[in-house]
Amino acid sequence: MTSSPIRILGIDPGLRRTGWGVLDIEGNRLMFVGCGSVETREQMALASRLLAIHEGLGRVLDEFRPAEAAIEQTFVNKDGVATLKLGQARGVAMLAPAMFGIVVAEYAPNQVKKTVVGAGHADKTQIQAMLKILLPKADPKSADAADALAIAITHAHHRGAAALRMKVAG
């Protein structure tokens, strides 16, 4: 009996640009499906930007129909206002798959880097180099889309443990 592929959506939340990446996993095989980003303009009102992120991710969810989703956890920086705005974008990005009945797993940035590159303090160029090896058909047009694919890869590797954590916590 062969198992059918499981489709995963990775999300890299951001107010300016929210990256998304979709891949299928079958056993230990990763297959690139698509990636991109939802962009907003700084001149837009905050509520309009959040709505644009929600609608953009809704279109991605409609088109690709993932079974699982993952998002990067927010890091707190020195700029409290920027951190709050990122948190709002992250909340909207988590809501979109939840409205489709999809549980959203969360991963720390250093866990994503360690999973994809092997080092928790890897930089963006190292992540992009590994993406070319792991997903040769992927051609992300932005760092945010590349990060979203890295988040999806992380979930593919840790999904069993993530499901168990959610079950225990729930």
UniProtKB/Swiss-Prot annotation:
Q: Name one GO cellular component term.
A: Holliday junction resolvase complex
Name of the protein: Crossover junction endodeoxyribonuclease RuvC
The entry's active site is D12, E72, D144
Q: DNA damage: present as a keyword of the record?
A: yes
Q: Which HAMAP family does the protein's record reference?
A: RuvC
Q: Which domain of life is it from?
A: Bacteria
Principal localization reads cytoplasm
Give the protein's biological function. Answer: The RuvA-RuvB-RuvC complex processes Holliday junction (HJ) DNA during genetic recombination and DNA repair. Endonuclease that resolves HJ intermediates. Cleaves cruciform DNA by making single-stranded nicks across the HJ at symmetrical positions within the homologous arms, yielding a 5'-phosphate and a 3'-hydroxyl group; requires a central core of homology in the junction. The consensus cleavage sequence is 5'-(A/T)TT(C/G)-3'. Cleavage occurs on the 3'-side of the TT dinucleotide at the point of strand exchange.
Q: Which PROSITE patterns match?
A: RUVC
State the oligomer form and interacting partners: Homodimer which binds Holliday junction (HJ) DNA. The HJ becomes 2-fold symmetrical on binding to RuvC with unstacked arms; it has a different conformation from HJ DNA in complex with RuvA. In the full resolvosome a probable DNA-RuvA(4)-RuvB(12)-RuvC(2) complex forms which resolves the HJ.
Localization annotation:
Cytoplasm
Q: Which PANTHER family match?
A: CROSSOVER JUNCTION ENDODEOXYRIBONUCLEASE RUVC
Residues annotated as binding Mg(2+) 1 are: D12, D144
InterPro entries per the UniProt record, alphabetical: RNaseH-like_sf, RNaseH_sf, X-over_junc_endoDNase_Mg_BS, X-over_junc_endoDNase_RuvC
**Species this protein is from:** Nitrobacter hamburgensis (strain DSM 10229 / NCIMB 13809 / X14)
- EC number(s) from the headed UniProt entry: 3.1.21.10
Q: Which gene encodes it?
A: ruvC
MF terms (GO), sorted A to Z? crossover junction DNA endonuclease activity; DNA binding; magnesium ion binding
Entry keywords, A to Z: Cytoplasm, DNA damage, DNA recombination, DNA repair, DNA-binding, Endonuclease, Hydrolase, Magnesium, Metal-binding, Nuclease
